């Protein structure tokens, strides 16, 4: 938070959501987690808690210019934090079901 990304974090303002991405249809295209609504405008950090790893595909990717960065260790029980303004996606699940708990840590709106 404050030391790494210089964010002044307040806490959780939304309940985390359970997401399931099913084989052949589960994916989430490129997006950011910020938006114009009151809650979405104060999202500073997104997080994903990986609840299983017995699936194929379904990679969490972050857009970094022309390349896509794939954070390592997307394994059961691991927790990934990332700035909410980063463009990211989840690729198509090709086998099994991907289960993840997602949420956001909030702070004052970006200025």
Regions found by a protein language model. Name each.
Residues 1-79, 85-111:
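Fe(II)/2-oxoglutarate oxygenase catalytic core
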């Amino acid at each position: 938070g404050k030391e790494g990304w210089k964010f002044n974090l307040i806490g959780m303002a939304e309940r985390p959501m359970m997401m399931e991405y099913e084989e052949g249809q589960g994916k989430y295209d490129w997006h950011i987690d910020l938006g114009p609504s009151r809650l979405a405008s104060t999202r500073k950090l997104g997080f994903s808690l990986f609840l299983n790893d017995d699936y194929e595909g379904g990679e969490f990717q972050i857009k970094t210019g022309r390349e896509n960065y794939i954070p390592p260790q997307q394994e059961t029980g691991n927790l990934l934090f990332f700035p909410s303004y980063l463009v990211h996606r989840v690729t198509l699940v090709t086998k099994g079901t991907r289960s993840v708990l997602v949420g956001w840590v909030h702070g004052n709106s970006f200025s």
